Amino acid sequence: MKHLVTTALAYTNGPLHLGHARSTYIPADIYTRYLRLKGEEVVHVGGTDNHGVPITLTAEREGVKPIDIVDRYHNAIKADLDSLNVSFDTFGRTHSDIHIETAQEFYSKLKENGYIYEKEIEQFYCEKCDMYLADRYVEGICPFCEGEARGDHCEVCGRHLEPTELVNPYCIHCNSKPEIKRTTHYFFKLSAMQDVLKEYIENSPEMPEHVKNMALRWIEELHDWDVSRNIKWGVPIPGCDDQVMYVWIEAPIGYVSFTKQLGGIWEDYWLENTGDSKISHFIGKDITVHHAVFWPGILKGIGGYKMPNAVVSGGYLTLENKKMSTSKNWVVWVKDFIENFSSDYLRYFFMINAPLNRDTDFSWDDFQKRINTELIDIIGNFTHRTLVFTERKFGSTPIVDSNQLIDEDKKLISKCESTLNRVDSLIREYNFKDALMEIILLAKEGNAYFQGMAPWAIKDDERLKEVMYTCSVALKYIIYLLSSFMPEKTALLLEYMNEELDLEVRGNPLKKPKVIFTKVSDEDISRMKENLLAATKKAETKTDEKSKKVKSGEKMDIIDIDYFGNVDLRVGQILEVEEVPRSKKLYKIIADLGDEKRQIVSGLKGAYEAEELVGKKVIIICNLKPAKLCGVESQGMLLAAEDDSIVSLLALDRDLPVGSKIH
């Protein structure tokens, strides 16, 4: 049987943290490595998700293009995965020709099969910016906890929100209150799939039970799915000029488009009637429904595609028993971890700490304890003492007649064989914790055997060879089974044994072994704790210093004169005015500030004709961070007063030269 293993597409709006590694990438890599170890044909598919509003927001804040953000974090994410020894056969990106073409083919086929239809919806619209606002472009007050919230989520209480639920909503670009307008979106008729999806889930024997239960609950109340968005950055909807495909309809198609990068063999893994293959999706718990309901619904709607056999859903990770938060820097980034510890230690800790489907915690103290008292004191102890003693006594692994082994020897070798079978079953069931526990138990048996045989006291050379041969057999089994979990450390063990990654003991000359498993020191842990607290305090300081946004109709907080002095207000003169393409409200203005000229985008269209603005002296905020409105960069802001529909530029009552400072 062929295997296709996929990992959730990493979102290119930041690097990877430990939560990503635990839920998705490490377990998928362990599973893939194990299948390869057993000689099975497997393709591991990964990549990055490059579209959606968070990326456009980051780009606007930094004054760059979305593709610049995508390129930066695609490369950073791949570097993080490489540092974790997570390897792929193909690693793609959704902002690529092959993906856009494949996604549009899927969409067109869904439409052709009658699963796409148009429907009017209500959506926030900003008059000043002349644009419909996606959920992340609206912020306001959470109606449940009264905390600051985004249009899709409240960070304070954790609730999912609709933008229209917000109290005092405002556009994040201009702070004005948006209005609700009707617009046409495209919907996927997912409700028509209810019976088909229920049958699929109920008849998927390899689907984990917790995933089945979650999917079946959703299927009971299945609704059609809005699959279009009024933004520019994304996969264009075929035949539509002003909307793109919602990321959750196009991103999973990346599993197909990225496999296509391997050439014609992609059909063997994805298309029906092309042979026996198994598809396993490794994801985080928060996107279980997307992969167990929405994605299979798309595949059923297309027709002719194989269905996922298993959606392997990893639980949430907390940090020191608190929810991780990237905005508060309460997070451990993969890069920071790898700069201080072996990636194998992280792979071990995450897989032994809890079953994959359960939520778990990362604590620096627990990490130190499990590495030092479990991995090193049990596995490290057996591997090191076996290698050191054998190399010192014989220089190579002894080979003996297995018929001469005594019962105690045969018992340990039998334990090796039963562990091999048990681990095989557990890994194929995605039960990585119990599989790793079996390896630890085998190492415990090895330590007990070594201690019981007391090879240092054996005078008979032949008997000593039998004992160390038996220990070497157990060591080979441990290395073989542990190699998928800890590829770096097991590669070093094989190097010292001068052996291949298999179960055969060849009697090769040994290299003088060094300590492979080094303990995590108290100083290491103290340093990491201090770094975490320092990063959190830095984030808190930034939050405190950040000026509060003023919403329409609200009074401003009282500020002191020093705070006001941070605003660079100057007299400017408008030189040129032209309309912003496809905008009903915006002008692109070139203003003279005396020592330089600035381009400013302002929502004065409708309030002033372009000709009457030319030559006017105005007041300009000059030290605002550049922002893009309708794709045009604005390098400042004109001051104006507004009352309902009346807009008036602030003017001087005496003539002053351009560039004059306002105090």
Swiss-Prot record:
Main EC class the enzyme belongs to: ligase
Catalytic activity: tRNA(Met) + L-methionine + ATP = L-methionyl-tRNA(Met) + AMP + diphosphate
Binding-site residues for Zn(2+), renumbered to this chain: C142, C145, C154, C157
UniProt motif ('HIGH' region) ranges: 10-20
UniProt short sequence motif 'KMSKS' region, positions renumbered to this chain: 323-327
Any one of the GO BP annotations: methionyl-tRNA aminoacylation
Cofactor note: Binds 1 zinc ion per subunit.
GO MF terms held by the record: ATP binding; metal ion binding; methionine-tRNA ligase activity; tRNA binding
Occurrences of domain tRNA-binding (ranges): 563-663
Keyword Aminoacyl-tRNA synthetase: yes
Coiled coil segments of this chain: none
InterPro entries (alphabetical): Anticodon_Met, Met-tRNA-synth_bsu_C, Met-tRNA_ligase_1, Met-tRNA_synth, Methionyl/Leucyl_tRNA_Synth, MetRS_core, MetRS_Zn, NA-bd_OB-fold
Compartments, record wording: Cytoplasm
GO CC annotations, alphabetized: aminoacyl-tRNA synthetase multienzyme complex; cytosol
Presence of the UniProt keyword ATP-binding in the record: yes
Enzyme Commission identifier(s): 6.1.1.10
Superkingdom, taxonomy of origin: Archaea
Amino-acid positions noted as binding ATP in the UniProt annotation, renumbered to this chain: T326
Cofactor(s) in the UniProt record: Zn(2+)
Pfam assignment, any one: Anticodon_3
Entry keyword set: Aminoacyl-tRNA synthetase, ATP-binding, Cytoplasm, Ligase, Metal-binding, Nucleotide-binding, Protein biosynthesis, RNA-binding, tRNA-binding, Zinc
Quaternary structure and partners: Homodimer.
Job description of the protein: Is required not only for elongation of protein synthesis but also for the initiation of all mRNA translation through initiator tRNA(fMet) aminoacylation.
Family stated for the protein in its record: Belongs to the class-I aminoacyl-tRNA synthetase family. MetG type 1 subfamily.
Record HAMAP family: Met_tRNA_synth_type1
Descriptive protein name: Methionine--tRNA ligase
Gene that specifies this protein: metG
